[in-house]
């Protein structure tokens, strides 16, 4: 069982769902009548995006990007790479980027600049988790679920080497799991 690799549970499934509902209400007010393009960052944001968008009670569209600065590492490489771009033209659209976690901030800073370059009407960020201690660029989310300490967290979409995404909570991975690789 994969739970044996988890040092402790930081945020329960119930806490995540309650926060998704709370953020959904705020986003409903923010985007009423704006038909936002909600952009999920693959693969990690998928569980949060699914729960969050079910709580947003206004017209919206969904699209996805696969953008990475990690690979299989535990520390950002610093180089942002688009693996899959949007299928939707963002010009004149209100963009809401949905992210699982903001750590270094490089990926989101890159995306905000990219969407502005592509002439989006507005660009805002909602993240399930924020790790301010990991930040290397000056970027802040407009909506944050939870602040987390500078520990290696997995679950609810967040992974280590493509595993642990299916855990229904946010947990701290035992250091011996990633230090042995």
From Swiss-Prot:
Q: Which cofactor does it need?
A: Mg(2+)
Q: Which UniProt keywords apply?
A: Cytoplasm, Glycosyltransferase, Magnesium, Metal-binding, Nucleotide-binding, Purine salvage, Transferase
> According to its UniProt record, which reaction does this protein catalyse?
IMP + diphosphate = hypoxanthine + 5-phospho-alpha-D-ribose 1-diphosphate; GMP + diphosphate = guanine + 5-phospho-alpha-D-ribose 1-diphosphate
Active site at which residues? 103
Which residues are listed for GMP binding in this entry?
Answer: 131, 152-153, 159
Q: Protein name, please?
A: Hypoxanthine-guanine phosphoribosyltransferase
- Give me the residues that bind diphosphate, please: 43-44, 165
Q: Name one GO biological process term.
A: guanine salvage
Coiled-coil zones? none
Asked if the Swiss-Prot or TrEMBL record annotates the protein with the keyword Phosphoprotein, the reply is no
